[in-house]
């Protein structure tokens, strides 16, 4: 068992009120202890490491200067908020991060008053902080809205939509741009730090305000010239002309690890009479932990690790990860097909597109955190005869639903959607669960929706999608490793809308979609042992349904149970509709649907989440037995 680090100063800080009692000269020590504590905690739990280490000093400075929680602090995405959680009364639970019943890996309203807004998806912070700022302004309450957003999240249009509407908030809105990728900032040094303090100071802002008021009395051409001169001078010295055009007062860039620079700038902005303000800070992912500094990508999200060596504890996988199966399969297909290309929205390794990119870099497009653009870009490619694969996590595809409908489905364009992280995802919890894609995609005309039962099926579905030119097609697959089945040397083109019988029975039929197939087979074994002959079908397609197969099973079995790892409104709803339309429920057939419960499940290990959801073999058996004991009105029959 690892020994917890000595943190004498941090031990005295239970809340930001305690932090504000410290002398400025003590903040450097506090930041060092906070960083050590975070490394120790994440080493025991796993989680997001690099991003949190990069904002330790910034977190200390924000809580020192601003009056949180009255000032509403919103961390974009939220995976960098571990230091924030430690300083806001949750240190005693920090070693429960992402564990069952423990702290969330993101900010969460129900967890603390210091988390005024739940985050996990990117680029929402400015909109939320603007909402807080305007609400307080209208209500006459004190309190600012503060958004901390990374430069990666600034690639999403939503951030600019918020900034374009922010002027009404005035000095109540502060945006802190955490530039940890050096993609925006010029070199940071003593001069830029001096300029940041200068242009955010009270005297400078006062003089600037006087100059502006005087310039308004000038003839219009002179007034415009004065305005442009001010912007040009500040733009030459400081950068940030884009943000000024959006109505923000820009300050920066400043060193996000230098508390002595951060404190005076934050104080100046806090006390500024004008606004909104944007502070540009430059930080380093993994700051203060050598392994993370040396390999930021490998230490963004980590398993449990040895704090001394940085070595992560990873169990040896018995089967390849689903995203790698997809990426490698697509790369092989593209060797023979120059029209295949891959699109990812800032998740190349998470989706397996990095495998494709190594072989076909000219046909790989990482569009950044811009799912809406990714889908319509893919539609344009498809309209011109390319075969685009848009690889997106299920939870993030939600952000582009209108584009799927309007730009792809209505025009019947053959965009291929590779939907990763389908189903429950474990430690990332409700915000990242892929629960809804079948429900919202299978309602759309023209769209084909498949779900892979294992990694071999994923190979077949990737190949099938590549050859499907008559309209859009989607295939979903889960997070993690496959089940260990051999991968086919030659992929099979699946017949659209046709399922398969895995085992034949006569009394009970289990209709599975996706990776619950393994549990359905276990349940069939248990039902057979009870004398209930059970058929198991892998439907493969949520849309179009294999109507012939389902009709045949419904007319030859007493009980039909659909099993899926998606929300209400998915496969089960479509099967029930089909049965109703064809009059197959009129003769006493017992149909039951099993799907995820109608709630947002908290984080836990995936197998425990599915057990809680009632989607494992014992639950399937129980559902069948209850169906056999009841008639369609729910009245128990005389026989067991």
Swiss-Prot record:
User: Which pathway does the database say it acts in?
Assistant: Metabolic intermediate biosynthesis; 1-deoxy-D-xylulose 5-phosphate biosynthesis; 1-deoxy-D-xylulose 5-phosphate from D-glyceraldehyde 3-phosphate and pyruvate: step 1/1
Signal sequence region = none
The residues that hold thiamine diphosphate are 79, 120-122, 152-153, 180, 289, 371
Task: Give a GO molecular function annotation for the protein.
Answer: 1-deoxy-D-xylulose-5-phosphate synthase activity
Q: Which reaction does it catalyse?
A: D-glyceraldehyde 3-phosphate + pyruvate + H(+) = 1-deoxy-D-xylulose 5-phosphate + CO2
EC main class here is transferase
What does the record note on quaternary structure? Homodimer.
The protein's role, per its UniProt record: Catalyzes the acyloin condensation reaction between C atoms 2 and 3 of pyruvate and glyceraldehyde 3-phosphate to yield 1-deoxy-D-xylulose-5-phosphate (DXP).
Protein name per its UniProtKB record:
1-deoxy-D-xylulose-5-phosphate synthase
User: Source species, please?
Assistant: Novosphingobium aromaticivorans (strain ATCC 700278 / DSM 12444 / CCUG 56034 / CIP 105152 / NBRC 16084 / F199)
């Amino acid at each position: 068992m690892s020994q917890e680090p000595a943190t004498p100063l941090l031990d005295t800080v239970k809340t930001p009120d305690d932090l504000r009692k410290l002398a400025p000269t003590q903040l450097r020590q506090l930041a060092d202890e906070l960083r050590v504590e975070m490394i120790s905690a994440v080493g025991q739990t796993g989680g997001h490491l690099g991003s949190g280490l990069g904002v330790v000093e910034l977190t200390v400075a924000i809580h020192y200067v601003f009056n949180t929680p009255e000032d509403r602090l919103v961390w974009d995405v939220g995976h960098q908020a571990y230091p924030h959680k430690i300083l806001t009364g949750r240190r005693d639970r920090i070693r429960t991060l992402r564990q069952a019943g423990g702290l969330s890996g993101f900010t969460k309203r129900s967890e603390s008053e210091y988390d005024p807004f739940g985050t996990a998806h990117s680029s929402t912070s400015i909109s939320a902080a603007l909402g807080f700022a305007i609400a307080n302004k209208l209500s006459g309450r004190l309190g600012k809205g503060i958004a901390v957003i990374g430069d990666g999240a600034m690639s999403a249009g939503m951030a600019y939509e918020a900034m374009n509407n922010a002027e009404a908030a005035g000095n109540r809105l502060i945006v802190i741009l955490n530039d940890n990728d050096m993609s925006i900032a010029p070199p940071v040094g003593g001069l830029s730090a001096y300029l940041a303090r200068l242009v955010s100071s009270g005297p400078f802002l006062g003089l600037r305000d006087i100059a502006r008021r005087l310039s308004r009395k000038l003839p219009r051409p002179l007034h415009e010239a004065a305005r442009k001169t001010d912007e040009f001078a500040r733009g030459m010295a400081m950068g940030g002309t884009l943000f000024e055009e959006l109505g923000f007062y820009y300050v920066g860039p400043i060193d996000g690890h230098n508390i002595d620079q951060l404190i005076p700038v934050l104080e100046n902005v806090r006390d500024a009479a004008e606004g909104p303000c944007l502070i540009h800070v430059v930080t380093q992912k993994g700051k203060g932990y050598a392994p993370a500094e040396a390999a930021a990508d490998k230490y963004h999200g980590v398993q449990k690790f040895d704090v001394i060596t940085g070595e992560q504890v990873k169990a040896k996988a018995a089967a390849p990860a689903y995203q790698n199966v997809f990426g490698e399969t697509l790369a092989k297909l593209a060797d023979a097909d120059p029209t295949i290309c891959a699109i990812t929205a800032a998740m190349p390794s998470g989706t397996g597109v990095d495998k494709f990119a190594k072989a076909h870099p000219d046909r790989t497009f990482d569009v950044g955190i811009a799912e809406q653009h990714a889908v319509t870009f893919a539609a344009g490619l498809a309209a011109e005869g390319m075969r685009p694969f848009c690889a997106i996590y299920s939870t993030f595809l939600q952000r582009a639903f209108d584009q799927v409908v309007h730009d792809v489905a209505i025009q019947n364009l053959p965009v291929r959607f590779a939907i990763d992280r389908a189903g429950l995802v474990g430690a990332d919890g409700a915000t990242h669960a892929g629960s809804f894609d079948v429900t919202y995609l299978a309602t759309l005309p023209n769209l084909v929706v498949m779900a892979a039962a294992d990694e071999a099926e994923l190979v077949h579905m990737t190949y099938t999608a590549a050859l499907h030119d008559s309209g859009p097609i989607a295939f979903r697959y889960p997070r993690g490793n496959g089940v260990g089945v051999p991968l086919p040397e030659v992929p099979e083109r699946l017949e659209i809308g046709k399922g398969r019988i895995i085992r034949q029975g006569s009394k009970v039929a289990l209709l599975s979609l996706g990776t619950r197939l393994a549990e359905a087979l276990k349940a069939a074994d248990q039902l057979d042992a009870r004398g209930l002959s059970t058929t198991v079908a892998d439907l493969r397609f949520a849309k179009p349904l294999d109507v012939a197969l389902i009709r045949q099973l419904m007319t030859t079995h007493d009980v039909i149970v659909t099993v899926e790892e998606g929300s209400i409104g998915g496969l089960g709803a479509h099967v029930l509709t089909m049965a109703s339309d064809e009059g197959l429920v009129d003769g006493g057939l017992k149909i039951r649907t099993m799907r995820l419960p109608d709630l947002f499940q908290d984080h836990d290990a995936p197998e425990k989440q599915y057990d809680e959801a009632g989607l494992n073999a014992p639950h399937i058996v129980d559902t069948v037995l209850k169906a056999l004991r009841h008639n369609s009105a729910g009245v128990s029959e005389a026989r067991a």
